[in-house]
Structures are given as C-alpha cells and as structure tokens.
Amino acid sequence: MKRWILCALALAGASQLSAQTKTPADYVDPFIGASTSAEAAGVLHGLGKTFPGAATPFGLVQLSPNTITGGDNGPGYSYEMKYIEGFAFTQMSGIGWYGDLGNFLVTPTTGPLHVVAGRHKELPGYRSLYSKKDEVAQAGYYATTLTNYNIHAEMTTAPHSGIMRFTFPQNKQSRIQIDLARRVGGTSTEQYIKVVNDHTIAGWMKCPPEGGGWGNGAGKANYTVYFFAEFSKPFKNYGAWMADIPEGISRKSESVTSLKYDSLVAKAKIVSKFTELQGKHLGFFTDFETKDKEVVLLKSGISFSSMEGARLNLTTEIPGWDFMDVRAKAKAMWNKSLSEISIAGGTEDQKKVFYTALYHTMIDPRATADVDGTYMGGDMKAHHTNKFVKRSVFSGWDVFRSQFPLQSIINPNIVSDMINSLVELADQSGNGYLERWEFLNAYSGCMVGNPAVPVIADAYVKGIRNYDEQKAYKYARNSVEKFGNIPKRKAMDISSTLEYGFDEWCQSQLAKWMGHPEDVSLYAERAQTYKKIWDPEKGWFRPKKADGSWEPWPKTGRLQQNYGSVESNPYQQGWFVPHDIDGLAELMGGRDKMIADLNSFFEKTPDNFNWNDYYNQANEPVHLVPFMFNRLGTPWLTQKWVRKICANAYKTGVEGLVGNEDVGQMSAWYVLAASGLHQATPGDPRYELFSPTFNRVAIRAGATGKVFTIIAKNNSPVNVYIQSATLNGKPYDKCYIDHQQILAGGTLEYVMGPQPNKKWGI
C-alpha cells in the first residue's frame, strides 16, 4: 500500500500538464450509459445501467449518487430521475436482476430530521431534488447540488475508502445523516454502530438474502459491510434513529419502499448521545450549525472483512483531510490504467466513447480484500494472502466473451486474481465447482453455462498461470460434470446445450494442456452435443423435450424470443458454436449458405442496434458472431459490420449504450473491436483482425511491457476495408494474429480503402 501512495503521488505530479493537453482520464464521461430507461431501450432490460460516481481502477469503493432504492435498478442511479436519496460507498455497474450494494448511504441535510427517504407524499423525507446544471461526473470525482438544502456535494475515492466534501448554507440546523439499513433492491436486516470518539463512528451492516438485493434474494447474496468513518466537524448533537421492524415483515425489493414499510420506519425511536447500538433498522445523524459556504467533510474506509479492516483501509489511504489530494491521486490512477491503450485519429466523441468504455472495463472485477490482503472467504471466515488480490463480481456468462480476453492483454494480473478467487471460493465454500455468476462469495446460479471454464482455458493458453493449476482443473472438471451435456440431462434447450458444448471443448483443451489425456476425448466428444439439437427439417437448432422429441415449432420460427433460448431467440443463440465453426457450416449446408444467412442476419438488423430479433448488440449471445466471417473466408464482412456496430451502437450521452453494461462486457467488446482485434473463440489464442475505428492504436501488453501498434492509413468512415497489411515492415496477408505476437510488441500497418479487397486475409 505504501507503493500505491508513492506511485499515486508520482503520477499526480506527472499529470500536471498544460490546460490544452487532454489526458485519457479527461475523455472519460461516467454519464455514458447511466440510464435505466426501459422506454428508451425499447425493452424491459433497459440501457447501460452504469453509475456516474467516483471510483478507482478495480477498487473496492464506488462513491455514487443514489436516486432510488427499490425495483430493478442495479446501479442505484438513473439520470432520468429527479431526486437523490443520498450517496453510497458501494455500487454495482451495469447489471439487471434488482442489483445490490448501495450501502452506507450518506445524505447532507438541513432543517427537521427525517428518517425515511420521502418516496410517499404522506411521509416527508430526506431525499432532495438536485441540480443537473451543477452535476459533474469525471474519472474519480462526482459533484452536484442538493437544491432542497442548497448543499453542494462532492466526492472522490481511494481504492478502499472515500471522502466527501459538503458546502453548506448558513443554517442553525445543518446535518449529515447516514442510513445504515439502506441497500439497493432491498435492505440490510441488522446493523451495529459504535461512537468511537467525538468525530468517529464504526460499525457494520448485514445483508443476507432475506433482505432482498441481488435477484431479490434469489441470488443468495450474503455479506456484511464494515465501515470506519470520520467527520471533520466534532459531534455535539448526535444520535440515531432505531425502527422496530416486526417479525414476518417482508424486507425485499418493493416491500421496503412501500408506504407500509416506510410508515414503520417513520415511527423510529430517536436515541441521543449513545455509545453503541444494534438493531434491525438504524441510522446515524450529527447536527451542527453552519456559516454560509462552510465546508464539512466525511471520510470512511469500507471493508467486507472487519471494522478493523475498514479502519486500516481509511488510515492507510486517506490519513488527512486534503480532498483535492485524494482527487488528484484518483485521476492519476485512472490516467495510468487508461494509458495501457493509446489512440490517435477519430473524432473527439469517438475518443470519449473509447476511453469511457475502457474506464467501464476497469470497475470490475473489484478488490474485496483489505489493504493488508485480508478478505472474507467462501467459508464466511477471514483469510489473508499476499499471493493474489481477492476479487468479486464475476458476471461469467457475459465477461468470458470480451472482458477477460481484453484484460488478458493489458491486465493479466486481474485475470489471475479472478481465477484464484473463484478457485479458492470453490475450495473454501465446500461447493467444489466454479460459480458462473459470483457476487461477494455467493453462488448465484445466474444465467447458463460454465463460463469460468473458458476464462481459465483462455488464460492458460496465453501463459497466465499464477494459480493452483491442478485445483483449477479439478474444479473446472467438477463444473462441467455438475452442469453440462451429461447423460442424465434429458431435456435439451438451445442456450444450455450450445454453451455447455463450448465449455466442454475448453475443458478438453485444458485436459490436453494440463496432462489429463483420459479427459481429452471425453470432453471433445461432448463438445459435439450441439449437433443433437439441429433439426435438418427446419434447418436450425431446436429444443428437445426430456423424451427426446422436439418442442413444438413456433409460428415465428427461429425468431421466437425465449424459445429454448436465454434472453435471445434461436436465430441469435444458434450461431454460438465458436469451437467448431466448420462443423456448424456443414450442418447449414456449407460455407456459402452459412455466409449468406449470416450476412442476412446483419442486413435485417436496425441501424441503431437497439434490442431486436437479429444481430442484438444489446445482449451477449451474439457478441462473437461478427468475427465468424473471418473464419469463413470473408474477412471484408467482419470489417464492414464491426465498423458499423462501433459507429452506431456506441454513443456519447446517458443513452450511449444500447444494452446493460454487464460488468464491463459491453464496453470491452467496443474497446477490442474499435482497436481492430477480437477473439472469435476464447480458449484459442487467435485474435481476428479487422479495420480499427482509429488511425492508430497502441496497446501495452501487461505481461511484457511491450507495445503492439496498429496503424490504419487512409482510414475514414468510408474507407473501412483493408487493402493490404504489413507486420513489422513485412507483407502480412493473414486476417488473424496470435496472442504471443501481441505480447512481443511490433507494428501492424494497414492501407485502407472504400471497397473490399477480397484477396486479402483469405
């Protein structure tokens, strides 16, 4: 941690550039995607669902405004909403299914004390209208004005802690209040608070499934948030509110925002000048008189391990009260991380989209270990390690496609950390298999497939092996045996069968590389199970019943949403055979027929790429599809369609993402695609090559420190086709490159043109 402080100080000094020079962090706009609007998206899933608040790269703390508590509002914030309830120290990014976190909600107020947010006209509350004119979101910084109170609120973060600066008006009854029960999508069911001294509090908030959250409790989220908070203004008149919540009252989702529930909280007992309190619904407040424009600060360390961990996190990272210093360090950290990829050319808006996308890929997987390496394990006990950083929020079904392949190039340590975290979780929890959607040690079981298996296979083949290989293999094998194309699985839907088949191919590859010859053919054979649900009469994949008969074919055919397909239709899901594209082509009647159908799939897609029945960039099942043209011998079609997707599906503004950010996946796809390279098959170190959005892209490989540069001469929105290429000065006629070639550094140079060169890359 001392190294972090020294590094941040050095970076802060180095980033003092002229006002005319923009750094990568200056291009970041955290408002991009910060909408949950189902109306704008045209589908219930909504848009990006990102949060606009302050964070550091892969940090534990995200300090952000919260506009609503209940409903399917994962980030806690939506740009369209008019009120802010407060500012929380933890958030999820880009997820649906009700979300979670949003803990330790801080709200500066004036006037009479209110203990509910004020969602119901019958019960006045502490929430406030806020000024859009004053709202600022930058990498590592957020600010707005709460207009009901005329309080200007600013916040910034270190990796495990955050600091807030409030500028108050003249008022004899100013206040900072903290709702300790608050939780996105539910509530904390039990809290503890201790007054340490006249300016410090510490405590915890338990968040079990009974309190809702992640999937309204179905995701089994069960964690405790610990805090250690200091105030710049000593306590004089302080206290707590303590609501009596009867047994049997639902504490999930919309229940905790109902008038019935808020009425219970509104009757809370006020406890003055206490030392310690524990209860089912607690909040803390400190009242004080302020002069006009008086500044009061609050800072807190957060931990998922202990109160001592929270204290250590705060005192290590933010020992003083210099808000601007913490802000400068946060920006410096972002500049260092974002500089792993540099771009030239393109418009200012395209640069903003690119660096914001790269920023969003660096929110998760977040650290959950304290500064000393202590973390909460899968056995609900504290553990300590210096071998890796415990990480969480593994949205596997999404992120194996682009997010982890991207990080394998620029941040291989993050990939290694996540694999270690999943393997240790399988070990400590006693579950013995790798979770597909992990959240703070919870086995959520969300989505389908065994996505941790391709993440491990992709890492291993790329030389990322800083974990217990045999444990990783064992738990990967257990995963495909528990959830896979196994004999006892009779009914066969499309999504699971195809996803499991790919995972089993990855397991076969791992068996080959890790010395398990007896498993190679077993899983290679199971990887071919996808052929069993191909209906030659319909010419497409079709789900089967448990007795082996076909499910009835719908009137809309392969366009029928959710017909054997998860968050997709068979037309979208059916392309997912990345491990055997030639085999898929054979089923379809040959390459020419497959290419024609695939091109038609794109031709019928709406230009804005919003949720639709064809190429649906708004959701993950199709994310590897554009790169299949390279594998089919028509690389100019990959060039054409990738450029169009990048131009039309990714924009500036709160509606800039056509679908949920999904913990970095939506943005990682863009970062790789706009850079001109993306895998068609994770687990195969081959990257497909195509035309980049920018004239120059320089990628620093995290494993070697060497820079791989892609240059596109004559590049423009019209000149999207590669005419010729050289690699390190020598002619290059392949439409792909190996991971090791990227790590070695070098220069790949294209000449671009307005018409396809159908001889290049064949």
Annotate each PLM feature.
Residues Q20-F404, S408-L498, A511-K532, K538, ...:
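Accessory carbohydrate-recognition regions in carbohydrate-active enzymes
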